[in-house]
Every structure is written in structure tokens, then in C-alpha cells.
Amino acid sequence: MIPGEVITPETDIELNVGRETLKVVVANLGDRPIQVGSHFHFYEANDALQFDREAVKGFRLNIAAGTAIRFEPGQSREVELVALAGKREVYGFAGRVMGRLDENVD
């Protein structure tokens, strides 16, 4: 191995295998582009984005880490979301949750 070398498998790397996903149509009703990052809690995304917010609570974009999707003004598009994992606690973002997503978890 050469220092700094990255050895990858010969097959494609699959992201979020076995995790719950859903597709949702999102429209940008604003007059400016809106960009949402890969790990942003989609429920708390910019209010100019129109979609069923309650349906996406606890989900983020199902895209590679460090990437984003840009919604142009007037644009409507379907995106795939993936359920948040781990402790399923959300803090920060727009401050709409600030705690556990699942009430029945101790």
C-alpha cells in the first residue's frame, strides 16, 4: 500500500441499504434558489419549499454525504428521502423539534 492510497471495492458502494425511504414532490414557491444539504432534517427546510412536512419528519435527503440538492424558484421536483438513524434525536436546524423524534423510546 502506498501512503494515502485508498483501496475501494470493485463493486458499487450502496448508501443507506435497508433503511426506510420515501419519495416526495417538493416545490420552491420562493423567488430565490434554495439548497438543502445531505444531512439536513428535511422537515425543517426553508418554508418557501412546499411539501407534506409531517410526512417527512425524521427524514433527510437520500444523497451522498457532503452533497446537496438545489431547488430553483418555481421548480417542482421529486426527491427521495431516507429515515434518520442512530438516537433519532434532532437539535438545531430551524429549532422545530429539539429532541426525540420517537416518543416511545426510552
Curated annotation (Swiss-Prot):
Its EC number is 3.5.1.5. It holds the Pfam family Urease_beta. Pathway: Nitrogen metabolism; urea degradation; CO(2) and NH(3) from urea (urease route): step 1/1. GO terms for biological process: urea catabolic process. One of its GO terms (cellular component) is urease complex. InterPro entries: Urease_beta-like (IPR002019), Urease_betasu_sf (IPR036461), Urease_subunit (IPR050069). It is an enzyme of class 3 (hydrolase). One of its GO terms (molecular function) is urease activity. It is found in: Cytoplasm. The keyword Disulfide bond does not apply. Keywords: Cytoplasm, Hydrolase. It catalyses: urea + 2 H2O + H(+) = hydrogencarbonate + 2 NH4(+). It comes from the Bacteria. Belongs to the urease beta subunit family. Heterotrimer of UreA (gamma), UreB (beta) and UreC (alpha) subunits. Three heterotrimers associate to form the active enzyme. This is Urease subunit beta. It comes from Acinetobacter baumannii (strain ATCC 17978 / DSM 105126 / CIP 53.77 / LMG 1025 / NCDC KC755 / 5377). The gene is ureB.
